[in-house]
């Protein structure tokens, strides 16, 4: 049996930060969120804004807890809020360029975001 990969392992293999979180979620939970939905989100949407790893975690939470149609309640917001709050509590920001300025490595935030996602969904 092979050892379970960390989200950052996928990052080191060439996926961007957001794609890596989604790939790890798919592998652990047997889902099939298309990786391509996150292809433009790495590097803070390529301009240093919302961290791609955090964004990827929010995509997974929305997939797991989101609504399917107009008029339905939207519980996904509760979960994405938890992800955002935990990240801000820990790092003081969710902004990619600020995280990098503070020398937070992408591998670190990818694994952190994935763990926060799993904790939020419990």
Locations of the language-model features?
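Active-site-proximal helix-loop elements at catalytic-domain edges
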Residues: 1-26
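A short glycine/serine-rich beta->alpha loop
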Residues: 5-13, 40-49, 98-103
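Mg2+-dependent prenyl diphosphate-binding active-site environment of isoprenoid biosynthetic enzymes
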Residues: 16, 59-62, 104, 108-111
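Acidic-glycine-rich active-site phosphate/pyrophosphate-binding loop
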Residues: 22-40, 88-91
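Short glycine/serine- and small hydrophobic-enriched flexible loop segments
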Residues: 23-27, 59-66, 115-119
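Phosphate-handling active-site elements
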Residues: 28-37, 62-79
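C-terminal binding/interaction regions
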Residues: 75-122
């Amino acid at each position: 049996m092979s050892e379970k990969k960390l989200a950052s392992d996928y990052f080191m293999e060439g996926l961007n930060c957001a794609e890596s979180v989604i790939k790890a979620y798919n592998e652990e939970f047997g889902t099939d969120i298309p990786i391509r939905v996150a292809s433009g989100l790495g590097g803070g949407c390529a301009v240093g804004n919302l961290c791609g790893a955090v964004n990827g975690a929010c995509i997974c939470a929305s997939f797991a807890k989101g609504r399917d149609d107009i008029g339905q309640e939207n519980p996904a917001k509760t979960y994405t809020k938890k992800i955002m709050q935990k990240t801000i509590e820990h790092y003081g920001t969710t902004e990619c360029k600020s995280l990098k300025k503070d020398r937070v490595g992408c591998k670190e935030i990818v694994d952190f975001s994935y763990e926060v996602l799993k904790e939020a969904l419990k």
